[in-house]
């Protein structure tokens, strides 16, 4: 539009246009109606009046839709309000706030509200014009707006009435023209060139994105068409077709052999195989020869026949392979062998036999020329061997296998295998010798026994083929053999066949042990292994398969990177493995029943589960050469395993390095069922296996190979030293993992933990050693041997890490593993006898009634030392601490430093200390009642009221305990942080600052020292109470009389009163328990035949975080389970009531990062170890694990207990003295180090290291 030069003209034109547009919009909305003409009695300029009249005169006005009532126009008002200020609003409008307020309150028509945008479509005024209008008319419009806006809330139809009839009027009166707003919002303007919306970078440079190049695509299509031309054979283009062709040819060849009618082979394999295939293909067999043919073919397929021997001489390898495949498939169908398994086996065998081609094709189609050659040889060999009697073939096999460098190198069976074959040539053994991939395949496929003998022959023939990878003995195959045969074979195999070295491919599923066929566990394990191993086998075979020219040496672990650590271990250089195997073979001869136990590195974790405990084939452990593989903590074990493996019972517990909490005992028991069956069959005793595991663990520290043969127990000191070294090496606290769930059921797993407790410092927990209890007979043997080799071993208290109920485990066992244990299920709780339950270490002196109650769960969470009966006499020691802020220990004058207001953290720490002291004081109030009361409570109804108190007190104490732990941790962390910061700044500090620093340091030291002092005093009290408790307990274990004090509100507190901080307490309890057990065992209780089998040390250190929660106490149910675990002596299991079961659950709270010099030296370990010779006795720095200690079942003999107590006292006193001395020395060191740390920066890193 042409703009008039004058402002007024400009405005006039603008408003005319605006009014016309609004009218047009109203009409299109069908909302224009006649309205009364109104005088614009406003103070607006005549121009505005004219404009208004023009709008009104047409007699049509936007009515306020009366029917709708006064619809509030707040939405539009808000929209206008939001838009107007920044968009060219005039100074006038900005200064006026009233219009805005009016606006918001005004109502308008619903149509206006909905159709504001329609008007925007007609706006084409340039911005500049609108802005000019706004500047000029702002005042006038505002006047109108004020006048009419006051009555706007009633949307009258006439302007004369002073009301605004429509939104358009309102907008017109508003100081800012809505057109301007809409323009600014982007309405009604010409769209800019769309190119302007595209960033220039897209035009400046071409895109690098790759699309479809039509030319390339077309050329590819043309090439594909050419390749797929039938003239080139489909196999050259599609691998699938190639495989299908091979299979079809195999079937056709099989059919031709069976039917005697030659068939045209599908697709000339010319592209892959030589033309002489046809010539080589054997003439169709007559029906009379069909059976022979099938046998030979199967043997070829299953046991890659030596490629050197070409029985068929020229049959194209593809045909041979196809034939073998077809035969195996047919047999599978008929013989009940699973076709897929056979195929897998055949593939593996072929790949192994045709070493030249390691590629998948070899295994899948086996159509490579080299394969064909090998196949020919194999077929010929198979034919020749098949013709011979199976047994003779087997014998040959044994000899040939011995000859075979592969087998020999494959440490697996050559030596052992030979013996095994000799003893039980039974088809299985010879086939087991075939350990080659075929063996694994045969294992996978439940081959008919018939296949196995032929396979043996073939294997013997396979001198040239490199099947080291599969060097697994046919033990794995045994499951395919009839159960009876399997049993006999298993025994012989156990004695002779050990797949010690060639375990590398065991993971491929060879883990299936024929020896274990007796036990379902093995079968299950085998199945799982097969599932796992199917892929593993293929990988293993391929990796192990090397050119035919290669030495027949099992590739080292390096050769087979794919293998799990366990596999790698088994792959240890064959030479080494061979030598070991030979040694093992000899040992095994001595221990015919023992089978090497497989140690699987954590890497093989998946295999671990699948391998199952009974997988003699996995003698990977034997390869001590790969300790690094087991570096996870298996190192000692694996090394020791070499000899142990041989000795290990056939059911090897796959020893897992995995750091999990022991699985529930139930899992062991489940395994035990299989184990018991094995025992029945004369399999090596589970005890042997346990011993083997234990020896393995200790191999590193003490080379007791000779003792191992005797299954001697390892000395606790040696173990402790070893563990200490391991811990020092930086092993983090780990969770112990239970043996595979499929372990022999008779097993009772008891774990002993060497705990090295440095007061106020990081505790170190040696990986707990686990003892597995099997049938009593076995235990007796172990006991005898153990006593001969190491008297202490018997004494070591075994820690039973049961899967306490899930509730309990919550914190300590939050880790899934423990929960798994729980899931495995717990045997029904068995009532504990008061004396047993009352043992100071066991809060569980709970009556069986309580066991099912939630309280019981809570009780379990109580620390093992939770029920120290602290005598009143000891109370005096704590009297000073009863006062929250009583003077620091007299020895520490640092209190004076507190002149400065303590920091918030220090205050918090003091509060925590106050809580601790109060709890201790509370305990001291009920010196003697606690122990007896607890024991009595379950038996007396009057004590029923104690339960709620007990729960409440327990919870409170737990809170205090956590706060204490938190306090210690925070304090240590705080100190470390402060020292680090101060050391940097200290040289630059002023004297005053340094003085403050020294004061704070002194304060912290005093706090720490006070805590240690409290622990020391608690220790003394506990010892005194323990004696008193025993005196009370022994005479009447069930004595129901409950002291009335027990009913007192706080009497129950005493149960958990012992300071959770007290690190020494658990140690002393362990020692006490050890000595007690020792005395009991020494007093002719050996006849009970319950010996503590050597624990298998699985590095399990419970993470400190987990440990923070209270330790889990074993409940009576554990005892019951334990007793049941003994397979051979179920009656004895029932006798639990007559046997004394000591349960100590030790809650070692995580200690805060220790300060400088926190790590205690091994000497302390030894001293603690000596006490009771218990492995637990050796504290390991940083132990925060919750270990549940469960000594062996012992008969309840009060008299004997008294005697033991006397014997025990001396040892306890000695140990206590040593501990005190070490603590005192440590405290001194800490004081000095603390002082130095504040001054010398060099010491700053020290504490950090100690904490780790």
Curated annotation (Swiss-Prot):
Residues 28-70, 306-483, 552-575, 595-636, 1095-1131, 1147-1180 are annotated as: Disordered. This is Protein ITPRID2. InterPro entries: ITPR-bd, SSFA2_C, TESPA1-like. Residues 395-407, 415-428 have a biased composition (Basic and acidic residues). GO terms for molecular function: actin filament binding; signaling receptor binding. It is found in: Cytoplasm. Keywords: Coiled coil, Cytoplasm, Isopeptide bond, Phosphoprotein, Ubl conjugation. Residues 357-372, 429-441, 1103-1117 have a biased composition (Low complexity). It comes from the Eukaryota. Pfam families: KRAP_IP3R_bind, SSFA2_C. The modification Phosphoserine is found at residues 90, 109, 207, 268, 328, 465, 643, 667, 736, 738, 745, 758, 766, 866, 898, 1036, 1051, 1056, 1059, 1114, 1154. Residues 36-57 have a biased composition (Acidic residues). Residues 955-1031 form a coiled coil. Residues 1151-1161 have a biased composition (Polar residues). The keyword Coiled coil applies. There is a cross-link at residue 807 (Glycyl lysine isopeptide (Lys-Gly) (interchain with G-Cter in SUMO2)). The modification Phosphothreonine is found at residues 85, 1149, 1161. The gene is Itprid2. One of its GO terms (cellular component) is cytosol. The keyword Ubl conjugation applies.
């Amino acid at each position: 539009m042409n703009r008039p030069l004058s402002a007024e003209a400009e405005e006039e034109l603008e408003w005319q246009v605006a009014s016309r547009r609004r009218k047009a919009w109203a009409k299109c909305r069908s909302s224009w109606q006649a309205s009364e003409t109104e005088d614009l009695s406003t103070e607006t300029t005549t121009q505005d009046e004219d404009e208004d009249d023009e709008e009104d005169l047409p007699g049509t006005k936007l009515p306020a839709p009366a029917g709708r009532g006064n619809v509030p126009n707040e939405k539009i008002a808000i929209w206008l309000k939001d838009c107007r200020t920044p968009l060219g609003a005039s100074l006038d409008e900005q200064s006026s706030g009233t219009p805005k307020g009016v606006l918001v309150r005004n109502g308008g028509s619903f149509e206006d509200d909905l159709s504001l945008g329609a008007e925007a479509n007609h706006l084409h005024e340039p911005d500049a014009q609108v802005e000019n209008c706004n500047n000029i008319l702002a005042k006038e419009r505002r006047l109108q707006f004020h006048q009419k806006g006051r009555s706007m809330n009633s949307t009258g139809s006439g302007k004369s009435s002073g009301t605004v009839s429509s939104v358009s009027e309102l907008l017109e009166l508003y100081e800012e023209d809505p057109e301007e707003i809409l323009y600014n919002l982007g309405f009604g303007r010409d769209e800019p060139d769309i190119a302007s919306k595209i960033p220039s970078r897209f035009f400046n440079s071409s895109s690098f994105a790759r699309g479809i190049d039509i030319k390339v695509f077309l050329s590819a299509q043309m090439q594909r068409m050419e390749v797929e031309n039938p003239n080139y054979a489909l196999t050259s283009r599609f691998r699938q077709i190639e495989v299908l062709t091979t299979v079809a040819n195999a079937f056709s060849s099989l059919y031709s052999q069976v039917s005697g009618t030659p068939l045209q082979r599908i697709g000339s394999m010319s592209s892959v195989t030589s033309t002489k295939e046809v010539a080589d293909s054997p003439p169709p067999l007559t029906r009379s020869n069909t059976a022979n043919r099938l046998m030979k073919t199967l043997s070829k397929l299953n046991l890659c026949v030596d490629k050197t021997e070409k029985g068929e001489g020229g049959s194209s390898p593809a045909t041979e392979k196809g034939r073998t495949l077809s035969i195996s498939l047919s047999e599978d169908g008929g013989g009940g062998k699973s076709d897929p398994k056979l195929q897998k086996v055949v593939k593996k065998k072929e790949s192994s036999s045709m070493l030249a081609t390691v590629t998948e094709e070899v295994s899948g189609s086996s159509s490579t020329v080299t394969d064909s050659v090998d196949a020919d040889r194999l077929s010929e060999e198979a034919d020749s061997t098949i013709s011979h009697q199976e047994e003779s073939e087997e014998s040959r096999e044994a000899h040939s296998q011995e000859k075979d460098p592969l087998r020999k190198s494959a440490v697996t069976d050559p030596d052992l295998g030979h013996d095994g074959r000799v003893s039980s040539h039974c088809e299985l053994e010879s086939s087991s010798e075939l350990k080659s991939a075929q063996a694994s395949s045969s294992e996978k496929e439940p081959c008919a026994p018939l296949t196995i003998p032929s396979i043996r022959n073939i294997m013997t023939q396979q001198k040239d083929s490199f099947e080291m990878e599969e060097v697994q003995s046919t033990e794995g195959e045994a499951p395919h053999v009839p159960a009876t045969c399997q049993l006999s074979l298993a025994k012989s195999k156990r004695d002779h066949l050990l797949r010690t070295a060639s375990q590398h491919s065991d993971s491929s599923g060879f883990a299936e042990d024929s020896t274990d066929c007796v036990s379902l566990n093995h079968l299950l394990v085998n199945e799982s292994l097969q599932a796992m191993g199917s892929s593993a086998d293929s990988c293993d075979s391929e990796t192990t398969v090397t050119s035919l020219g290669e030495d027949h040496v099992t590739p080292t672990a390096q050769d087979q990177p794919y293998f799990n650590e366990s596999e790698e271990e088994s792959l240890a250089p064959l030479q080494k493995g061979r030598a070991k195997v030979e040694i093992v073979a000899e040992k095994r001869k001595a221990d015919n029943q023992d089978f090497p136990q497989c140690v699987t590195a954590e890497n093989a974790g998946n295999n671990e589960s699948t391998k199952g405990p009974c997988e003699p084939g996995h003698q990977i452990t034997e390869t001590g050469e790969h300790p690094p593989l087991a570096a996870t903590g298996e190192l000692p074990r694996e090394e020791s395993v070499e000899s142990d493996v041989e000795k290990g019972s056939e059911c090897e517990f796959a020893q897992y390095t995995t750091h999990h909490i022991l699985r529930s005992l139930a899992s062991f028991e489940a395994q035990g069922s299989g184990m018991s069956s094995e025992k029945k069959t004369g399999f090596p005793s589970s005890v042997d296996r346990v011993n083997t595991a234990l020896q393995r663990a200790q191999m590193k520290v003490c080379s007791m190979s000779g003792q191992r043969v005797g299954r001697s127990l390892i000395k606790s000191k040696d173990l402790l030293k070893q563990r200490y070294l391991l811990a020092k090496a930086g092993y983090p606290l780990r969770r112990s993992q239970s043996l595979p769930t499929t372990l022999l059921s008779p097993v009772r797993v008891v774990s002993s933990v060497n705990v090295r407790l440095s007061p106020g410092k990081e505790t170190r927990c040696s990986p707990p050693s686990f003892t597995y209890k099997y049938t009593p007979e076995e235990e007796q043997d172990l006991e005898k041997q153990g006593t001969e080799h190491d008297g202490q071993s018997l004494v070591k208290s075994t820690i039973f890490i049961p899967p306490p109920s899930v509730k309990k485990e919550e914190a300590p066992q939050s880790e899934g593993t423990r929960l798994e244990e729980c899931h495995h299920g717990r045997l029904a709780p068995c009532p504990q006898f008061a004396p047993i339950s009352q043992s100071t270490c066991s809060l569980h002196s709970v009556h069986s009634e309580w066991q099912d109650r939630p309280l019981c769960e809570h009780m379990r969470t109580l620390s093992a030392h939770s029920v120290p009966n602290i005598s009143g006499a000891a109370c005096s020691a704590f009297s000073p601490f009863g006062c929250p802020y009583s003077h620091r220990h007299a020895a520490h004058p640092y209190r004076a430093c507190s002149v400065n207001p303590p920091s918030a953290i220090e205050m918090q720490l003091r509060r925590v200390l106050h809580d601790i002291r109060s709890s201790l004081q509370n305990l001291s109030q009920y010196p003697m009642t606690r122990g007896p009361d607890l024991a009595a409570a379950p038996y007396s109804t009057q004590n029923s009221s104690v339960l709620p108190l007990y729960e409440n007190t327990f919870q409170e104490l737990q809170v205090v305990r956590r706060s204490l732990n938190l306090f210690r941790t925070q304090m240590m962390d705080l100190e470390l942080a402060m020292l680090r910061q101060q050391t940097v700044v200290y040289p630059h500090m002023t004297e005053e600052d340094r003085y403050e620093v020294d004061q704070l340091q002194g304060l912290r030291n005093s706090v720490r020292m006070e805590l240690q002092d409290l622990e020391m005093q608690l220790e003394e009290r506990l010892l005194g109470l323990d004696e008193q408790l025993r005196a009370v307990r022994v005479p009447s274990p069930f004595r129901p009389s409950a002291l009335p004090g027990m009913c007192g509100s706080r009497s129950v507190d005493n149960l958990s009163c012992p300071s959770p901080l007290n690190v020494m307490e658990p140690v002393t309890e362990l020692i006490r328990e050890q000595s007690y057990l020792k005395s009991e065992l020494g007093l002719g209780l050996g006849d009970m035949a319950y010996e503590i089998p050597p624990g298998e040390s699985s590095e399990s250190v419970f993470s400190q975080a987990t440990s923070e929660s209270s330790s889990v106490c074993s409940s009576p149910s554990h005892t019951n389970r334990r007793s049941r675990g003994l397979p051979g002596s179920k009656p004895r299991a029932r006798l639990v009531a007559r046997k004394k079961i000591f349960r100590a659950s030790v809650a070692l709270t995580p200690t805060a990062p220790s300060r400088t010099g926190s790590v205690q030296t091994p000497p302390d370990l030894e001293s603690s170890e000596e006490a009771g010779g218990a492995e637990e006795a050796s504290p390991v720095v940083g132990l925060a694990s919750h270990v549940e200690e469960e000594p062996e079942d012992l008969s309840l003999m009060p008299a004997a207990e008294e005697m033991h107590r006397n014997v025990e006292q001396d040892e306890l006193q000695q140990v206590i003295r040593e501990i005190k001395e070490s603590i005192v020395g440590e405290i001194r060191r800490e004081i000095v180090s603390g002082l130095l740390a504040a001054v010398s920066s060099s010491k700053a890193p020290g504490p950090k290291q100690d904490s780790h």
